[in-house]
Amino acid sequence: MDTTAISPLTPLGVIPDLKNATSVPFNETACENWKEIHHLVFHVANICFAAGLVIPTTLNLHMIFLRGLLTVGCALFIIWATLYRCALDIMIWNSVFLVVNLLHFIYLVYKRRPIKIEKELSSLYKRMFEPLHVPPELFQRLTGQFCNIQTLKTGQAYAAEDKTSVDDRLSILLKGKMKVSYRGHFLHNIYPCAFIDSPEFRSTQMNRGEKFQVTIIADDNCKFLCWSRERLTYFLETEPFLYEIFKYLIGKDITNKLYSLNDPTLNDKASKKIDRQPSLCSQLSVMQMRNSMASTSDSEDGLQMFLRGTSSSSSLRPGRTSPYLRTSAKMKPIEESVEDDVFEAPSAEKLELQRLP
């Protein structure tokens, strides 16, 4: 009598062969019969994948190379699956990967495209902004939206003392030379790639309605880049990196103007060599010069005193201040409460405490 039990899940009249059922999975798992090696296209595709993954991230264009190699690898896989394997699923999946990597590759190449800077602004970018690692596309945004290039002929005035407002613009000289004077007395020159009105911009950031305390005249046919001050300020608030760049450049420009005041014979080549971090004392000295000339009753004597050099003011005994360094009621000097605390004179109580054992 046959004692083999028929499973309820087994179709009627069909008895499973247990020997064959256990032997087939064993043969497939053991891989006793290896299939032949795939076509060369398959291996080249995998080589592209491997090469893309081992590209070092320190390489400047590593993402472009990675996406490019992945795109080539996916294309080779599609060729292999279509011509040599006839596998529809492999072809579909690699087609999806190909589209994704190709789009990313095009996007990366587009971002790396060379930014065309106007010829008139190329020297400005290379001298002032490129050394500070400002990207060309950011510089293009800075100079392409709310600024324009203006010209002045020889003898024309950029600003007149007590007449021109300082609230309207901020400019950088691109070509030519300008002369800064106070009541007919020459102070210093302004050369290309230098701010024209940086002291006024720095001192009146918190105060509006001020007027220029000096006269700025074109000593040659000049061309300058002019920003709308209000729109520039708003733009810098949205770009913290550029905001810090402008703070540095304006401070450095004020320092260069201070050196020009101390040495009126300083030319453009010598001014290029001045590359120091601007200090508070330097900025205060420039502003005190312009403020004091506008406030002193004997302004002619004060001007001559200042033009002889700032060494006379530094030789004053502690506790005495020069009458020519009084601040103006019109042009308010820079207020830096933190730095002012450093230069406070020690009080008598502090000296007594220091003498105690």
UniProtKB/Swiss-Prot annotation:
User: According to the UniProt topology, which residue ranges lie Extracellular?
Assistant: 1-38, 84-89
- Tissue occurrence: Expressed in the heart and skeletal muscle (at protein level). Isoform 1 and isoform 4: expressed in heart, muscle, brain, stomach, kidney, lung and spleen.
Fetch the InterPro entries from UniProt: cNMP-bd_dom_sf, POPDC1-3, POPDC1-3_dom
Localization of this protein: Lateral cell membrane; Cell junction, Tight junction; Membrane; Cell membrane, Sarcolemma
What keywords sit in the KW lines? Answer: cAMP, cAMP-binding, Cell adhesion, Cell junction, Cell membrane, Developmental protein, Glycoprotein, Membrane, Nucleotide-binding, Tight junction, Transmembrane, Transmembrane helix
Relate the outcome reported for changing residue 273 to A: Abolishes homodimerization and cell-cell adhesion
- Domain of life, per lineage: Eukaryota
Q: Name one GO cellular component term.
A: caveola
Membrane-topology descriptor: Multi-pass membrane protein
Q: Its Gene Ontology biological processes?
A: epithelial cell-cell adhesion; epithelial to mesenchymal transition involved in coronary vasculature morphogenesis; epithelium migration; heart development; positive regulation of locomotion; positive regulation of receptor recycling; protein homooligomerization; regulation of cell shape
The biased composition feature labelled Basic and acidic residues covers 347-357
Q: Which residues are glycosylated?
A: 20, 27
Spell out which residues lie on the membrane's Cytoplasmic side.
60-62, 111-357
**Keyword Nucleotide-binding listed:** yes
Query: Which residue intervals are annotated with compositional bias (Low complexity) in the record?
Result: 309-323
Name any one GO molecular function.
Answer: structural molecule activity
Report residue spans for region: Disordered: 309-357
Any transmembrane segments, and where? 39-59, 63-83, 90-110
Which family does this protein fall into?
Answer: Belongs to the popeye family.
- State the oligomer form and interacting partners: Homodimer. Homodimerization requires the C-terminus cytoplasmic region.
Q: Describe the function of this protein.
A: Cell adhesion molecule involved in the establishment and/or maintenance of cell integrity. Involved in the formation and regulation of the tight junction (TJ) paracellular permeability barrier in epithelial cells. Induces primordial adhesive contact and aggregation of epithelial cells in a Ca(2+)-independent manner. Involved in epithelial movement during corneal sheet formation and regeneration. May play a role in VAMP3-mediated vesicular transport and recycling of receptor molecules. May play a role in the regulation of cell shape and movement by modulating the Rho-GTPase activity.
Task: State the name under which the record lists this protein.
Answer: Popeye domain-containing protein 1
